Amino acid sequence: MQVFEGKLNGKGLKIGIIVSRFNEFITQKLLAGALDCLTRHEVENTNIDVIWVPGAFEIPLVAKRAVHKDYDAIICLGAVIRGATPHFDYVAAEVAKGIAAVGLEANKPVIFGVLTTDTIEQAIERAGTKAGNKGWEAALAAIEMANLFKKV
């Protein structure tokens, strides 16, 4: 029996990070968590590109272009927070579907690190307080998946 798993060492990996500027007070913390994780796992700073987009809805479109670059993985970071209108439901669903579709179509790890929360407080908790930092977790998944793709 063979077992395949990705190692958590980022040495030599090239990572693209797409970050939504909307709700930047949250996404800035997600980005900081992702960068910290990548650095601690030996991804060289020169092998990390950060791409800012206006909002979460634009992430899949830019990810679709970025997968054709030499990245081993792409991390998508954003924060969609529920408001008083159904806008949240449309944006959250389309961003999730879009990011998944890009990864499947490109056969490359495209990691979903977009918060979809009911409140600002929940977003803050997931950006580095009570519930950890989902940017860090997305970066760790990117490292693991990039290494796994080299084996499978």
Curated annotation (Swiss-Prot):
What is catalyzed by this enzyme? (2S)-2-hydroxy-3-oxobutyl phosphate + 5-amino-6-(D-ribitylamino)uracil = 6,7-dimethyl-8-(1-D-ribityl)lumazine + phosphate + 2 H2O + H(+)
- Which of this chain's residues are annotated to bind 5-amino-6-(D-ribitylamino)uracil? 22, 56-58, 79-81, 112
Q: Entry's InterPro entries?
A: LS, LS/RS, LS/RS_sf
* Record's keyword terms, sorted: Riboflavin biosynthesis, Transferase
Q: Which domain of life is it from?
A: Bacteria
Q: Which residues form the active site?
A: 87 (proton donor)
Put simply, this protein is called 6,7-dimethyl-8-ribityllumazine synthase
